[in-house]
């Protein structure tokens, strides 16, 4: 198995910079689109053989240094008694919603048997991959936002109303999701994943004070329960939370493009970093793309180690050939001698 990604997770510099992409298994790939014509999204997630096939596609086509399991961050909710649905042009929908302390009774304990297909897919993949497999889950907070809002939103009014009107109830919800996510990710680890990534996609909607109060303690607790494999913590739009992020004890911090990676390197000394190219750079010219890729690579040179990635998922309009070129560029990039 290729080791560059796992070495970088542990803070070891390798001969080349390892690279993989969030949402690398997805809608921009013709192979994925063919399967999607036959099956709806949830069926693909819930059929281990299909989930494994989709996970393998970008490894074979792009030559990336790690695979990430094809699934969705909302999958565990069905195993807690909620209903999830994916509607074209609307995104994920979650019912019923939890918006008060009284609503917490809706939520059941995570039943791993109901999502056994996730672990079956992992067991298939570890026998077929020649690169490490990354498992993943939403952070307790990001999971909570979907359950409270019922889907995607811009203002998170219901989330913040619950948080500020009934803080004790919100803390209870966070505790429930922390326990469930610990259980879910540890089962992925038992099934064979080599690393896990926690997606805190919506952490950036909070002030530093509220992140410290309502999110940080639960993320720390979650990370500390997962230390048998490297843990990557991804958050979006969180440059203003950087001082809190460095205290999380994640093995790797994955950052988006809204912070210069050189600045992040200076602020997060002795911390492996992942990121942080703007995904939409891939829609531009090769010249503009590689100019920015080089800036990321050089900017991250001072980090303990670096895993090249995007600052968010691959956009649906991205060219497969452009991603291939990007992988080759990163692998072949030579730094000037220090």
UniProtKB/Swiss-Prot annotation:
Keywords for this protein: Cytoplasm, Decarboxylase, Lyase, Porphyrin biosynthesis
Pathway named in the protein's UniProt entry: Porphyrin-containing compound metabolism; protoporphyrin-IX biosynthesis; coproporphyrinogen-III from 5-aminolevulinate: step 4/4
SUPFAM superfamilies: UROD/MetE-like
Site (Transition state stabilizer): 72
Main location: cytoplasm
Binding residue positions for substrate: 23-27, 72, 146, 201, 312
Subcellular location: Cytoplasm
Gene Ontology biological process terms in this record: heme biosynthetic process; protoporphyrinogen IX biosynthetic process
Entry annotated with the keyword Cell cycle: no
Pfam family, one: URO-D
Matches recorded under PROSITE patterns: UROD_1, UROD_2
UniProt-listed InterPro entries: UROD/MetE-like_sf, Uroporphyrinogen_deCO2ase_HemE, Uroporphyrinogen_deCOase
Catalytic reaction equation(s): uroporphyrinogen III + 4 H(+) = coproporphyrinogen III + 4 CO2
GO CC field: cytosol
EC number: 4.1.1.37
GO molecular function, one term: uroporphyrinogen decarboxylase activity
Function: Catalyzes the decarboxylation of four acetate groups of uroporphyrinogen-III to yield coproporphyrinogen-III.
Assembly behavior: Homodimer.
Similarity remark: Belongs to the uroporphyrinogen decarboxylase family.
UniProt name for this protein: Uroporphyrinogen decarboxylase
Protein source organism: Thermodesulfovibrio yellowstonii (strain ATCC 51303 / DSM 11347 / YP87)
């Amino acid at each position: 198995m290729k080791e560059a990604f796992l070495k970088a997770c542990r803070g070891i510099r390798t001969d080349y910079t390892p690279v993989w992409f969030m949402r690398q298994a997805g809608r921009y790939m013709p192979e994925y689109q063919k399967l999607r014509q036959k099956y709806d999204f949830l069926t693909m997630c819930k059929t281990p053989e299909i989930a494994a096939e989709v996970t393998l596609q970008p490894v074979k086509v792009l030559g990336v240094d790690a695979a990430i399991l094809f699934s969705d961050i909302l999958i565990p909710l069905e195993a807690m008694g909620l209903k999830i649905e994916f509607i074209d042009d609307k995104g994920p929908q979650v019912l019923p919603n939890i918006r008060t302390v009284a609503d917490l009774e809706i939520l059941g304990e995570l039943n791993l048997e109901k999502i056994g297909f996730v672990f079956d897919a992992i067991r298939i993949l570890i026998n077929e991959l020649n690169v490490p497999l990354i498992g993943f889950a939403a952070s307790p907070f990001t999971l909570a936002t979907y359950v409270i809002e019922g889907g995607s939103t811009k203002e998170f009014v219901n989330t913040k109303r619950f948080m500020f009107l009934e803080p004790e109830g919100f803390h209870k919800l966070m505790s429930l999701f922390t326990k469930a996510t610990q259980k879910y990710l540890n089962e992925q680890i038992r099934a064979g994943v080599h690393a896990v990534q926690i997606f805190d996609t919506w952490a950036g909607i909070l002030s530093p004070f509220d992140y410290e109060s309502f999110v940080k303690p639960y993320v720390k607790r979650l990370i500390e329960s997962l230390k048998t494999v490297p843990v990557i913590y991804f958050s979006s739009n969180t440059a203003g939370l950087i001082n809190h992020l460095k205290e999380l004890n994640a093995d790797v911090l994955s950052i988006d493009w809204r912070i210069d990676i050189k600045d992040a390197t200076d602020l997060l000394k002795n911390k492996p970093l992942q990121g942080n190219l703007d995904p939409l750079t891939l829609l531009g010219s090769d010249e503009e793309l590689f100019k920015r890729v080089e800036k990321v690579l050089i900017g991250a040179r001072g980090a303990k180690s670096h895993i090249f990635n995007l600052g968010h998922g691959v956009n649906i309009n991205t060219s497969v050939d452009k991603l291939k070129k990007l992988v080759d560029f990163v692998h072949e990039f030579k730094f000037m001698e220090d």
